Amino acid sequence: KIKKLQANSTVTNEEAMYLNLWQREIESIGDELIAANDIEYTNSKVQVMATIDSFGNLIKSEILISSGNTYVDKMAIDILEKAAPFAPFDPKMINEYGILEIIRDWNFTPR
C-alpha cells in the first residue's frame, strides 16, 4: 500500500515526526551541496516527489513541477539522492503502508 503525503495532508504523530526528520536531513544536505557548488540562486521553486520504502530507501525521485531552471531541478534531485537513505518507518507506519510518497515544494533563494 502507498501513502501520499502532500503539504496539506493530515498526518499522524509518527508521520509528523518522520517528515520533520526527513526535512531536516534534506535541508542539511541541501545547504552542504549548495555551499560546495558556490552557486547563487535566483528565487526558484520546484515541486519534488520522493518515493521511500519502509526501510528508508529512496526508490524514486522526480520533479513534478519544474522550476524552469534545469540546474535548480538537477540540484533538487541531487539533494534527494545524496540525503538517502532516510530513517526506516515507525512500526505504526509499517502496519498501514510500505511505500511513502512525499510531495513538497522546495524554494531556492539567494543567500
Predicted region positions:
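Short, small/polar residue-rich loop motifs at catalytic or cofactor-binding pockets
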Residues: 41-46
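Conserved "boundary/linchpin" sites in short secondary-structure elements
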Residues: 1-6, 24-30, 53-65, 77-88, ...
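A short acidic/small-residue loop/turn micro-motif
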Residues: 65-71
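Short, solvent-exposed loop/turn elements at beta->coil junctions and helix N-caps
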Residues: 36-39, 92-94
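Intrinsic-disorder/low-complexity signature in envelope-associated proteins
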Residues: 1-25, 31, 35-38
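Intrinsic-disorder/low-complexity, polar/charged segments
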Residues: 10-13, 69, 91, 111
